[in-house]
Amino acid sequence: MRFSLLDRRVERNGVLELARKHHVTIIAYSPLAQGLLNGRFHDQPQMVHNLSGYRKFMPDFRESNIKATQPLIDELKKIATAHQTTPAQIALSWVIQVHGDLVVAIPGATTVRQAEQNARAMRVKLSQVEVQHLDEVSLAIAKK
C-alpha cells in the first residue's frame, strides 16, 4: 500500500485499523512519494522537466504540487538539520515510527548511495514533538 507523509489514505480508509485488528503488517511502498520527499525537486524545480517514465505524468510532480508541498519539505529539512541527516531519512523514519511495527517501509533506490541512505533512516529516532509537527504539516496537504 502507498503510505507516506504525502499519502495517508490507509489511515482514513479503514485499512490501517483492519490490519491492526488482524495483526497484519502493512508494507508501505513509495514512502518517499516517488522521490518527492527528498527535497531535490523543491530545491531545483527545473528537474521536473527532465523526468522520464510514469513520473513525468504524475500530478505530484506538477509545479502547483511542488509549491503546495513546500511547507512539508521545509519541516523535513529543519528536522533533518537537527539530526544531521537528510530530509528523505526523516520522511522514512516517520513512516517507520509513526505506527510502530504495524507498518514496514520499502523505499526504492536507483543507486547504492540511495540504498545506504535509506538504511540509515532506521537509526533516526524522532521525538514526539517532531512527529507531531510532521503530522500537522502533512495532514494539511496529504492525500486523505
What function would you assign to each model-found segment?
Residues 1-143:
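Beta/alpha (TIM)-barrel catalytic core signal, keyed to glycine-rich beta->alpha loops juxtaposed to Asp/Glu
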